[in-house]
Amino acid sequence: MKRKNRIIKSFILLAASFSFGSLVQAEPLFAQVPGMVSYTFREEFKRDVPGTLDKIRALGITDMEFSNLFGQTATELRRLLDERGMVCSSFGVSYDDLLNKTDEVAKNAVVLGAKFVRVAWLPDRQPFTLAFAEKTAAEFNRIGKRLHEQGLIFCYHNHGYEFVPHGAGTLFDVLMAETNPQDVSFELDILWAHLPGANPAQLLEKYGSRFKLMHLKDLRLGVKGDFSGKTAVENDVALGTGQLDLPAILKAAKRAGVQHYYIEDESPNTATQVPQTLAYLKSLTN
């Protein structure tokens, strides 16, 4: 009888160990709900701001990065967000406005409740040279300091052309090296890092907390890279169906301390691709 009890206990312990192992394996890799970049629904926002916010809220998303006020004042947009229990954590502006309307940009960001002010495109950047990178870094430092003094964090969003080779690295490395970490942070757009040949996970490991924000995107299979900073919008595909190694990127992002993740899908297929992307993120496990 004792031997039989020992055998039963052994089976119970073995079963429990398998169950525990299954639970550990089922731990979600990406537990939070991501935010949304307004550009994903740019056409809808042009027609109906309140209705588009309702549509995004219905997906379970409450964190927004706005790249446009869509005809609203910052106060009006903040009211619409508050009514829906939503927030704007990052406010995207043009580089021209950042340079020439810095105080207005800062005021709008504060009204919106945003902590971050983001720029995603540099005008007159062709060709992207060492001299241009150094000039841009100096401007970033100056503007970043002004925003920092107003309680905001400036972030630059890479767009591909910065990864032109230079020395043992790229001109993106020059931007990192020549900017002050206390005044200039970065938003990693993983598609626009991958397309010119960089490895997003390795960038996160290398620069860590310099990356405060991330755009979650995937690139259609078969698309070849370049340094143009441009690709057809149809090349944005649902996460997990393209070229990028999302699990490796998300693990590296967690280690780096990325604070906000935003879905950005520039394609005309957001009605199907955004839900597919959300389902993919939920399916990931460690």
Show which residues each predicted segment covers.
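N-terminal pre-domain/capping segments
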Residues: 2, 25-116, 285-286
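Bacterial N-terminal signal peptides
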Residues: 10-22
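Active-site beta-loop-alpha junctions enriched in small/polar residues
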Residues: 39-41, 67-69, 93-96, 122-124, ...
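Active-site acidic/histidine proton-transfer and metal-coordination neighborhood
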Residues: 62-63, 70, 95-185, 271
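Catalytic-core regions built around general acid/base machinery
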Residues: 76-83, 139-147, 248
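Secondary-structure boundary/capping motif
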Residues: 84-90, 118, 146-148, 180-181, ...
